Amino acid sequence: MLKAIVTNDDGVHSRSLRALAESLASRGWDVVVAAPLGNWSGYSKSIGRFRGNRVYRFESRGVRFFTGDMPPAALVGTAIDIAGFEPDIVVSGINYGPNLGIYDFFSSGTIGGALEAALRGFKSVSISSACREEETDCLPEALSISLAVVETSVETLSSSAGLMVVNIPRSPRGFKVTRPCRRVPRFSGEIGEEGSLLVEKFDHSRLFSSEHDSCDGRLFSMGYIPVSLYKIDNGWIHPLDPSRDGYLKAVEDILNYKIFPSAGKQF
């Protein structure tokens, strides 16, 4: 029986997280959800200050849950180190909203949960979607694609490529293995009353749509599912270059064949 830890930064009550965990369990996986009580978006691989020092355990629909008031990375570590659950893969997602480029790689709590596992030597994948929390129509497609990604990742990831980052747009055209975009978004805002600063979150999807290079954000804006792979070497994180590694092209072909047969090579 394959074993998986499922986490995210949107919280343990996220519909997309529960749909993914329950779907894996229904396929015979032994699943532990290790996700925060509330929203910890933007906390990266932080382990936090542990606003609560309790981790609560319960079981629902064949899935065991570990949750507490701490970020995803801390809960993944808790499930592995304290609960003693050693997974075949750690899946972080399905996140509401994409996580694109180097900036999101170092900011996203969802990617941080996957990175925590990768640093410990476990295969891990972060999955984000264009779907937002209030939307329901795009979740079934994102779930179907995510299940194929998990099944492929547990077979293909290795010590030479232990972390996969995936972003699913609406009505995707197929998978493309690529590298993360390098552009860094700027904060925007204005001076408010009494000198306060009103800061707005920048919609960086516009930033990447003007990229000339086929990095993840650019491909996402074109309707593709960008896939970036990383090697963890003695604690250092190395994004892999698809133009130099034939293995990455093989991963792309396998993913496309599972979901988009016309776009992939048959194996």
Swiss-Prot record:
GO terms for molecular function: 5'-nucleotidase activity; metal ion binding; nucleotide binding. It is an enzyme of class 3 (hydrolase). Pfam families: SurE (PF01975). GO terms for cellular component: cytoplasm. Its cofactor is a divalent metal cation. Binds 1 divalent metal cation per subunit. Nucleotidase that shows phosphatase activity on nucleoside 5'-monophosphates. This is 5'-nucleotidase SurE. It comes from Aeropyrum pernix (strain ATCC 700893 / DSM 11879 / JCM 9820 / NBRC 100138 / K1).
